[in-house]
């Protein structure tokens, strides 16, 4: 249910309501392309914070055996910052940026430790399907609350004449915080903390010292995880494009004149269409392999980025949104499960921390490039088409990954560990 709960942040805050609110209300005192650029820079900075912290905290969580506690801590930061978005009003773009930075830090940070639980609750044969079903649940849960929020925003003033025009949007931010918190509770009640496993010479040592030593050792021995590292580089490249499309599509559409109803309606459609396609990609991976399934999604994303350059009508946005829905969940779920198969289970939080570094630096580079091109050119059409370079390079590097060899390397590392209470 954590996918169901936290995905409300991804839909209402990251993708749909807040970007439009940032452009139309919080950033209404700025030029449209300036508001777009500052949203991109805000997204980049929040991702940078997580990228710096995630590997260290992941290593500490592995050593101490408390992944759930770290998950809860970051969730608390995210829920609190999201609730405080209620106080953002006209011209408050700086406050909106600060709260979004903390909200996204909490959201992304919690996912490091949530993802680290995946190899412990699913077998190697099940991990693609479990990850895909989790993403499907996320799309449905996030989409359901987004639908409720859209109804609130569209009909709130009609039902309650004379209210502040921004009130329903601000209440939607509060609803995300409540939804996220409530649907996180089953995880903390029913999922057990994984067994703590450490190296023989680490027992009784200082957690911070051990964690830094582990990180240093991992960097030194990264050649031993050649396929895992190669995949992380590939992921970094193609995730630049995917993440930027997710976070910048709505504000891009707003800039080129697509109506708010179309923007939010399309994103709502994406949530429900993406759910069955995420499950379908899990099944496809079982038939043709995880790597080939990711290839397919990246080819489609390349076509989407090209199509985005020519976007001018509302139906174009709907069509591109449907194409995104076909591949968004599958590409993310299979990437998450593939790294889970090629990492040592005893160091899952540490390696998902590294995964988060590559993911967050992709969230830095992509939106930053988008904002930079938009600033230099005065509009954002070239920004969207420039994303194809990330997909093409990602596919080239992905072709160098030997999945079976990577899985065997992870198993050999786990065999060196001892179990402690």
Residue ranges and their predicted role:
Residues 52-66, 276-290, 374:
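Helix-to-loop junctions at the C-terminal end of transmembrane segments
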Residues 32-33, 153-178, 372-391:
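A membrane-interface helix-boundary motif in multi-pass transporters
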Residues 69-84, 292-307:
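Structural signature of the two symmetry-related core transmembrane helices
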Residues 1-47, 227-266:
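Helix-loop boundary and gating motifs at the non-cytosolic
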Residues 81, 92-110, 316-330:
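Hydrophobic core of transmembrane alpha-helices in multi-pass small-molecule transporters
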Residues 109-122, 330-343:
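Intracellular juxtamembrane helix-capping segments at the cytosolic ends
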Residues 87, 179-190, 385-420:
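Multi-pass alpha-helical transporter architecture, strongest
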Residues 192-232:
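Juxtamembrane intracellular "pre-TM" segments in multi-pass secondary transporters
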């Amino acid at each position: 249910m954590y996918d169901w709960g936290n995905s409300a942040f991804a839909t209402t805050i990251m993708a749909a309501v807040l970007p439009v609110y940032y452009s139309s209300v919080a950033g209404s005192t700025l030029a449209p392309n300036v508001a777009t650029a500052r949203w991109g820079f805000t997204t980049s900075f929040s991702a940078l914070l997580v990228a710096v912290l995630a590997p260290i905290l992941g290593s500490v969580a592995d050593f101490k055996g408390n992944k759930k506690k770290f998950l809860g801590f970051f969730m608390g930061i995210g829920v609190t910052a999201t609730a405080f978005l209620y106080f953002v009003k006209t011209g408050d773009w700086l406050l909106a940026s600060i709260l979004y930075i903390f909200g996204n830090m909490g959201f992304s940070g919690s996912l490091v430790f949530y993802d680290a639980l995946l190899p412990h609750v699913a077998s190697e044969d099940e991990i693609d399907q479990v990850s895909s079903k989790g993403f499907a649940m996320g799309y449905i849960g996030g989409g359901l609350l987004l639908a409720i929020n859209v109804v609130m925003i569209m009909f709130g003033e009609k039902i309650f004449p004379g209210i502040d025009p921004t009130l329903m949007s601000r209440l939607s931010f509060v609803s995300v915080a409540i939804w996220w918190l409530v649907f996180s509770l089953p995880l903390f009640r029913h999922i057990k903390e994984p067994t703590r496993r450490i190296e023989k010479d680490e027992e009784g040592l200082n957690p911070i010292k051990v964690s830094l030593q582990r990180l240093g050792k991992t960097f030194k021995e990264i050649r031993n995880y050649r396929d895992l590292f190669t995949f992380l580089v590939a992921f970094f490249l193609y995730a630049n494009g995917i993440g930027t499309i997710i976070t910048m599509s709505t504000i891009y559409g707003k800039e080129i004149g697509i109506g708010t109803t179309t923007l939010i309606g399309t994103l709502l459609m994406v949530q429900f269409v993406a759910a069955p396609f995420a499950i379908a990609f899990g099944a496809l991976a079982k038939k043709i392999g995880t790597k080939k399934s990711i290839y397919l999604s990246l080819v489609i994303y390349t076509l989407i980025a090209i199509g985005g350059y020519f976007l001018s009508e509302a139906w174009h946005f709907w069509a591109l949104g449907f194409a995104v829905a076909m591949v968004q969940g599958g590409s993310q779920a299979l990437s998450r499960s593939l790294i889970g198969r090629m990492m040592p289970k005893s160091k899952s939080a540490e390696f998902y921390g590294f995964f988060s570094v590559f993911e967050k630096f992709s969230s830095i580079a992509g939106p930053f490039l988008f904002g930079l091109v938009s600033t230099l050119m005065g509009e954002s059409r070239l920004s969207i088409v420039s994303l194809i370079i990330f997909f093409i390079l990602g596919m080239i590097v992905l072709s160098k990954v030997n999945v079976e060899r990577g899985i065997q390397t992870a198993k050999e590392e786990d065999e060196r560990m001892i179990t402690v209470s």
